[in-house]
């Protein structure tokens, strides 16, 4: 029985490695969990303090159909916990989202082109009331990658989501470059981009990164008003491989214009009656996490 279990594990890992063949960024996280925390001040007369902790859980399951096609199932979960504190009161509020991207990746026979398409249904709410269509968002993601050579790839595409504030389109473009056997640049702009350097190959990696992540959440008990969260980050990161496929990572950076803000239903008018979701000052943040990661540049 133990031998059969080991064979299954070996088969799963072999399948995942096959699915990474031709992937432009150097790794895929099969499981990734992290917690990001920041402390800031509100721009109010009470000198209120803000503490925000963001918990993430991400899963990726690539299933190889044949030498050119891979079926992809992903799951993203988030819990955004915000606290406001001043001399009069302390209040904590939680927002949640669950995203289930499903799609296909196709690579041409000559390995020059790769196309990925995902349908992305999402529930995003405080979940204080029964789940309904008011909590549902539906989006899509399309990305084409062209390999100029083994070290240089160009990517272009489009992201769309039906947010609670309206239709949200993001054109995508990027260049992945293996500058040396230690230095890599990769990502998809304007959402994420990394400059990564291998301090100790297969053990220790560090670098600089940028992240842009816009999303919205329904406030169920407040006439379906919503919170819009525009998150821009610049940060430094450190990845420590405690085992070949297990990585402990840490990030330290600064927010740019970060403020989860509440708005009235079907408007772009700020809902001032919810002080916890009013403007805060930019702040430094710290993020730590653990991932089951498979890199295509590990021997």
Protein language model regions, located:
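Short glycine/proline- and aromatic-enriched beta-strand/turn motifs that initiate or cap beta-hairpins
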Residues: 24-85, 295
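Transmembrane beta-barrel strands of outer-membrane/channel proteins
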Residues: 30-37, 73-79, 117-123, 156-160, ...
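Sequence/structural signature of outer-membrane beta-barrel proteins
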Residues: 38-43, 78-87, 107, 120-130, ...
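Residues that define the transmembrane beta-barrel architecture of outer-membrane proteins
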Residues: 49-55, 92-100, 132-138, 167-171, ...
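Residue-level signature of outer-membrane beta-barrel architecture
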Residues: 61-63, 104-108, 146, 177, ...
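Outer-membrane beta-barrel translocator/channel fold
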Residues: 62-64, 77-90, 189-286
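Repeated loop/turn-to-beta-strand initiation elements of outer-membrane beta-barrel proteins
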Residues: 66-71, 110-115, 151-156, 182-185, ...
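Outer-membrane beta-barrel "beta-signal"
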Residues: 172-177, 238, 279-299
């Amino acid at each position: 029985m133990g031998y059969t279990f080991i064979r299954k594990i070996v088969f799963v890992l072999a399948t995942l490695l096959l699915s990474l063949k031709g992937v432009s960024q150097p790794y895929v996280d099969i499981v990734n969990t992290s917690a990001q925390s920041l402390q800031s001040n509100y721009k109010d007369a009470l000198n209120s303090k803000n503490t925000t902790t963001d918990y993430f859980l991400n899963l990726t399951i690539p299933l190889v159909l044949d030498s050119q096609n891979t079926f992809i199932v992903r799951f993203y979960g988030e819990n955004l916990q915000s606290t406001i504190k001043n001399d009069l009161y302390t209040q904590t509020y939680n927002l949640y989202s669950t995203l289930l991207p499903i799609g296909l990746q196709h690579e041409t026979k000559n390995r020059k082109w790769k196309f990925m398409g995902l349908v992305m249904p999402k529930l995003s709410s405080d979940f204080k009331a029964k789940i309904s269509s008011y909590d549902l968002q539906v989006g899509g993601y399309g990305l084409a990658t062209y390999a100029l050579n083994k070290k240089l790839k160009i990517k272009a595409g489009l992201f769309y989501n039906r947010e609670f504030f309206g239709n949200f389109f993001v054109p995508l473009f990027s260049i992945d470059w293996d500058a040396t056997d230690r230095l890599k640049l990769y990502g998809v702009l304007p959402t994420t981009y990394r400059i990564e350097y291998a301090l100790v190959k297969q053990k220790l990696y560090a670098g600089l990164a940028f992240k842009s992540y816009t999303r919205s959440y329904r406030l169920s008990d407040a006439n379906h008003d919503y919170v819009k969260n525009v998150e821009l980050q610049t940060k430094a990161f450190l990845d420590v491989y405690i085992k070949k496929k297990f990585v402990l990572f840490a990030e330290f950076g600064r927010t740019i214009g970060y403020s989860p803000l509440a708005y009235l239903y079907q408007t772009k008018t700020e809902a001032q009656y919810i002080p916890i979701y009013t403007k805060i000052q930019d702040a430094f943040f710290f993020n730590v996490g653990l991932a089951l990661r498979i890199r295509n540049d590990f021997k």
